[in-house]
From Swiss-Prot:
Subcellular location: Apical cell membrane; Cytoplasm
Complex and partners: Exists as a mixture of homodimers and homotetramer, both catalytically active.
Name of the protein described by the UniProt record: N-acyl-aromatic-L-amino acid amidohydrolase (carboxylate-forming)
Main localization, broad class: membrane
Keyword Cytoplasm: yes
Statement: the UniProt record of this protein carries the keyword Ribonucleoprotein: no
Membrane topology (UniProt): Peripheral membrane protein
Residue sites binding Zn(2+) per the record: 21, 24, 116
GO CC field: apical plasma membrane; cytoplasm; membrane
Length: 318
């Protein structure tokens, strides 16, 4: 698998969104801070625009009010006729589409960085909806800038034809996910780390805009294979939970025959797949309602092509 060559047109319209989920507090408070102190997001060729994506859910300190905003930015929702009974997040998705889009047009923002926290032990994880070369080069840059801190890229290609995330409104985007952090809690270490990583990502965009050479390389990425539900009773209630041997081991190999769940009756449930997978978002609190105990991924080696050098030119923030 390899990604296609990407454009070297400079990225001048960049957004940093936080609070897409209103109880993921690093993004919430970074967005709030930058709305009052935007200088931290300025670079010579562009100034990233901070956005508090879901103000109502943020005020209520909940993931969402009516439906998941990060599943509501489809062209179907964005293009539908507004009604008074529309869910709040659908209304907000349309507002974000006016601000950052319109989705799928040349007028959309060049790049959106969406900030998230998870209760799972993912560490630093970039989530990309495509294997576009720029996103892989970005992840590689962060890995080289932070050799002691694992930074993994999780390729989450939506099933079907429609993308639905907040960053999908722009021409390109990526999600910066960090955990573990409880919902509604702000940890100083993760806050500082996310802030530093955002700075590094904006630095990379600036280097990209100025024509930095981006040679070809190889890297491991994790591609989503689907979800695994908890064991359940005939009535649909939980019959067990994540096994202690699996808990907190995100991005580590899970082999056939190894335990994945501990039933309340005491028995172990073993993984019955026929190949090694790499679980991600293990026991994520927000996924209980989605009937997801963890996501399965495959670890694949990709060859990322070089991006042709951009001849530096005078660029100013629009």
């Amino acid at each position: 698998m390899s990604s296609l060559p990407g454009s070297r047109e400079p990225l001048l319209r960049v957004a940093v969104t936080g609070g897409t989920h209103g109880n993921e507090m690093c993004g919430v408070y970074l967005a709030r801070y930058w709305l009052q102190n935007p200088g931290e997001l300025q670079r010579p060729s562009f100034s990233a625009m901070p956005v508090l994506a879901n103000p109502a859910a943020t005020a209520a300190c909940c993931r969402y009010l009516d439906r998941d905003l990060n599943r509501s930015c489809t062209l179907t929702f964005l293009g539908s006729t507004a009604t008074p009974d529309d869910p709040y997040e659908v209304k907000r998705a349309r507002e974000l589409n006016q601000l950052l889009g319109p989705k799928g047009t040349g007028q959309a923002f060049d790049f959106t960085l969406d900030l998230h926290n998870t209760t799972a032990n993912t560490g630093v994880c970039l989530i990309s909806e495509s294997n576009i070369s720029f996103n892989l080069h970005l992840c590689h840059y962060l890995q080289r800038q932070n050799p002691g801190m694992p930074c993994r890229l999780f390729l989450y290609e939506p099933a079907g034809t429609e993308t639905f995330s907040v960053e999908s409104i722009s021409k390109n985007g990526i999600c910066l996910e960090m955990g573990p952090q409880p919902q509604g809690v702000l940890r100083a270490d993760l806050f500082s780390r996310m802030r530093a990583l955002v700075a590094s990502i904006l630095d990379f965009i600036e280097l990209f805009n100025q024509g930095m050479d981006l040679p070809a390389f190889e890297m491991d990425i994790y591609r989503n294979l689907g979800s695994v539900d908890f064991p359940r009773t005939a009535d649909g209630d939980l019959a067990g939970t994540v096994h202690p041997q699996l808990q907190d081991h995100d991005f580590e190999p899970l082999r056939p025959g190894e335990p994945i769940f501990k039933l309340f009756s005491g028995e172990d449930v073993l993984y019955e797949g026929d190949s090694i997978v790499y679980p991600v978002f293990i026991n994520e609190a927000a996924y209980y309602e989605k009937h997801v105990a963890f996501l399965k991924s495959e670890k694949i080696r990709v060859t990322v092509p070089a991006l042709l050098r951009l001849t530096p030119r005078s660029t100013q923030t629009p």
